[in-house]
Amino acid sequence: MRWTFLSTCSVNVAILTLLIGCQSDQDAIGPAGDCLVQSSVTNGQAIAGSYIVTYKSTENLPVAPNARVGAAVQQLLTRHGLNDPNAQVLFSGESTGFLAHVSAAEAETLKADPSVELVEPDRIISICSCVDVAVTSTLTWNVKQTGYGRGDLNPDKTAWILDTGIDLDHPDLNVDTGRSQSFLTGKTADDENGHGTHIAGIIGALNNNIGVTGVASGATLVALRVLDNEGEGKLSALVQAVSYVNTNGKAGDVVNISIGGEGTSASLERVIKQAADKGILFAIAAGNEGESAEKYAPANVNHANVFTVSAMDQSGNFASFSNFGPTVDICAYGVRITSTYLNGRYASLSGTSMASPHVAGLLLIRGRTIPTNGFVKNDPDGTPDPIAGGE
C-alpha cells in the first residue's frame, strides 16, 4: 500500500520557494506546471513488528479509550501468551482497535482468534509539498468562484483537519487549540510543514481584510496532527485521529482528509464509516495519480456523508494529475491555490489536497446538500464530475 499526501507543487510568482522532500506522483504534471520531487524511500512501507488489530469486544466498553479498555487489550494478548506493555489503543466501542508490537508469527496467532476481526500492518504515510510562498489577494479567485459564507455564524460546527497540524497562532485562522491534538509522540498540534495550515485557510481563513478569505470564513478549526515536519507518519495515527473525531465530534461537523494511499485499509474505512453514521461529514481528496480513485484509500470509501473530491483548474478543466472514477462525488479547484502557510505567511499549492477543503468549507456552511455549478471539462472517465459551489 502506497500512502501519499495529495498535493503537488504550483509554479507562481513567489517571494521564496521551499522544496520539501516528499512523495510525489509520476503523472502529476498538470496545468499549473506542478513540480515533481523524488519519492521518499520509506513511503508506504510496512513497519516491522507493528500491527493494527481490531477485535470484537466481549463486554460493553466505553467509546473513549481508557484504562479499562487498555486492560481488555492486555487480556487478549495474555490469552495468547503475548507480552506488549506498549500496546496502544486506537479506538474502542463495539469493536476495539489497538497497535500491537508483535512479530509476524504472533500477528498470525492473533488473526486466528475468532474474536479478532482484522489484523493489518501499520505503515508509513508521507506527503508531497512543493510550495511557492506568494503575494496574496484577500478574496482569491477560487473562493470567489466556489462561493463563500460566514463560518463564524455556525460556532457549534467544527472543521477537523487531519494533516500536518495547523500554525496555531496564524493571525488569519480561528484555531481551537484546546481540542487540537497531536498523535505523534513528543509533538504538539502546531504545524511544522505548512500543508495542514494551507488546507485550514481554504476552509476557514478569516474575512478580516488581511491575507485570504476561506470558503467558511472564521470557522472553528481543530488541528489533528498525524504527520511530522518531514510529512511522514503512520496509518495507525490516522486511524486514531478519525476515532478521536468520532468520540469528540457531532453531527454537522466536517472532517478534511488530504492523505491517501494505494490499496485499501479496512481499519481506516471502519472508523470513517462509524463517524459518518453519526452525521459527521467527510471531504476526502481523490488523489494525484491520474488513475481511478477506486484504487486508493480513503478516496474509495463510499458513504452518503463521505465526499471524494477531484481537482480542476481555474478554467474548469480536469487537472491532469487528479484521480477520477465512480468513487469521486464532486470536483473543486485544485490548481495554483493561494492560502495560509507557516509563520503567518501565505503560499500557493496545487493538488487534490487543495480541492478537498473547498468542499469541506461548503459542507460547513451549507450542510451535505452541496450547491453545484455545471460539470468539469475533460473528465477522463467520460462522466464529468459536478463542480462544487456557485449560486
For each feature predicted by the language model, list its residue ranges:
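C-terminal motif of bacterial Sec signal peptides marking the signal peptidase cleavage site
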Residues: 18-21
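Bacterial signal peptide processing site
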Residues: 23-26
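Inhibitory N-terminal propeptides of secreted protease zymogens
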Residues: 30-129, 251-253
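Protease zymogen maturation seam
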Residues: 36-38, 75-89, 95, 111-158, ...
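Substrate-binding/specificity loop regions of serine endopeptidase catalytic domains
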Residues: 129, 186, 212, 232-235, ...
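Subtilisin-like serine protease catalytic core
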Residues: 148-179, 187-237, 250-253, 301-305, ...
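Hydrolase catalytic cores
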Residues: 200-203, 222-228, 254, 320, ...
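C-terminal subdomain of the subtilisin-like protease fold in secreted/lumenal serine endopeptidases
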Residues: 216, 241, 248-271, 278-280, ...
